[in-house]
UniProtKB/Swiss-Prot annotation:
Protein name according to UniProt: Pigment production hydroxylase
The organism's place on the tree of life at top rank: Bacteria
Statement: the UniProt record of this protein carries the keyword Oxidoreductase: yes
GO molecular function: acyl-CoA dehydrogenase activity; flavin adenine dinucleotide binding; pigment binding
A Pfam family per the record: Acyl-CoA_dh_2
EC number(s) from the headed UniProt entry: 1.-.-.-
SUPFAM superfamilies listed in its UniProt record: Acyl-CoA dehydrogenase C-terminal domain-like, Acyl-CoA dehydrogenase NM domain-like
Enzyme class: oxidoreductase
Ranges in coiled-coil conformation: none
Length: 387
């Protein structure tokens, strides 16, 4: 596959009107529509980060961010699932080369869902492991072909070993649990496994992945694949936040132009308060985009300190700050949308709910991220399993 960044972005922009039109149906469906997944596959978007060795595009993380930000501006749920499906091609490289080749055997993309939350039971057996448990927040589960699970192996005389497990869809059960106020269209259902056998080659050393040094990562010469897990995960979620904020600001502009008082019949656009609130919204969207660009510049700079937990914590805080900025901006906007702005058909209320949920995601929680940096700064113990 050989597509330039410009060609790929042209394809993305061509899909945006359809994704915007489907936004409300996506929310009602609680997952992306089948035709949306088909569009993502046929356009080549999902091969953005797949190594060229497996037929992918192997474009930069900044390209993936542009794609996700653009889609999220019209439908944050679609942008979120797109980001995780694109990112799955990177995360698969945490596993062995044999597992990678299995996943990409017949196509240059992978529909993979999963979380980093540990399973309840992992047992070492001949040739692999048996896993049992249930995990939540599996975005993209409805269309996923593979699932990833984290777990800790306890063997007598050895330190606990955190591993990642790769499991085909036929070995898991997707539970219909995704009923939530925001990001409703992501299909982030619970997933369960019951005494499922996972061969050794479908496991990855999660502790090494946290530092970007899993053997499966290192077989690829492109340094993009050598990033630590957490900063990469931040690179998946932050473009959704920034795109959603831009979409909200655009929706607020339109809402301000259209809104008319019920009693006075005065147009909202003629009020100084509305004009000031609109200015703040646009400034916040611009600031978020600038901060996102700086985040990716730092992420891709190939700095030696990237393997240091403090540096990873700083990247997490930068991402959380972006989410906090977006939520505060939305809180300000919705004070000026009137009652009609909360109708189900009004895009602005969907952005408000989506960003409210995004901002409390485990990776984007400002309180936790701030506390961690505070503890590092004060030379206090830090216990974050993802650092």
């Amino acid at each position: 596959m050989d597509i330039t960044r410009t060609e790929l972005m042209d394809r993305v922009h061509a899909l945006v009107p359809a994704f915007a039109e489907r936004a409300q149906k996506t929310e009602e469906n609680r997952a992306p529509l089948d035709e949306t997944i088909t569009d993502l596959i046929d356009s080549g978007i999902l091969a953005t980060l797949t190594p060229k060795e497996y037929g992918g595009l192997e474009l930069g993380l900044d390209v993936a961010a542009d794609i996700v930000r653009t889609i999220s501006a019209v439908c944050p749920s679609t942008g979120w699932v797109t980001s995780f499906y694109i990112g799955a091609a990177w995360r698969v490289n945490i596993f062995t080369e044999q597992a990678q080749r299995e996943v990409f055997a017949d196509k240059p993309y992978t529909l993979t869902a999963g979380t980093a939350a540990p399973l309840g039971q992992v047992q070492k057996v001949d040739g692999g492991y048996r896993i049992t448990g249930q995990t939540a927040w599996n975005s993209g589960s409805v269309h996923a072909e593979w699932f990833t699970f984290a777990g800790v192996v306890f063997e007598e005389g050895s330190a606990p070993t955190p591993l990642w497990f790769l499991v085909p869809r036929e070995d898991v059960k997707v539970l219909d649990t995704w009923y939530i106020a925001g990001m409703s269209g992501t299909g982030s259902n619970d997933i369960s496994v019951d005494d499922v056998f996972v061969p050794e080659y479908r496991t990855g050393p999660f502790a090494l992945a946290l530092a970007g040094t899993a053997p499966g990562q290192l077989i690829h010469p492109n340094p993009m694949y050598h990033l630590p897990f957490l900063p990469f995960a931040m690179a998946e979620v932050t473009p959704v936040v920034v795109g959603a904020l831009r979409g909200a600001a655009d929706a607020f502009v339109q809402r301000t132009k259209d809104r008319q008082g019920t009693i006075s019949q005065e147009k909202a656009s003629g009020k100084q308060a509305a004009q000031m609130r609109l200015g703040r919204a646009l400034a916040a969207a611009d600031a978020a985009e600038t901060l996102l660009d700086a985040f990716f510049e730092r992420l891709t700079a190939q700095r030696p300190e990237q393997s240091d937990p403090r540096d990873r914590a700083e990247m997490k805080l930068k991402a959380a700050y972006l989410a906090d900025l977006a939520r505060n901006a939305l809180n300000d906007m919705v004070r000026g949308i009137g009652g009609d702005g909360y109708r189900n058909s009004a895009p602005i209320q969907r952005y408000f709910r989506d960003l409210s949920v995004l901002s409390v995601h485990a990776f984007l929680d400002i309180d936790t991220a701030s506390e961690t940096i505070g503890r590092f700064t004060l030379d206090l113990p830090v216990s974050d399993p993802l650092l």
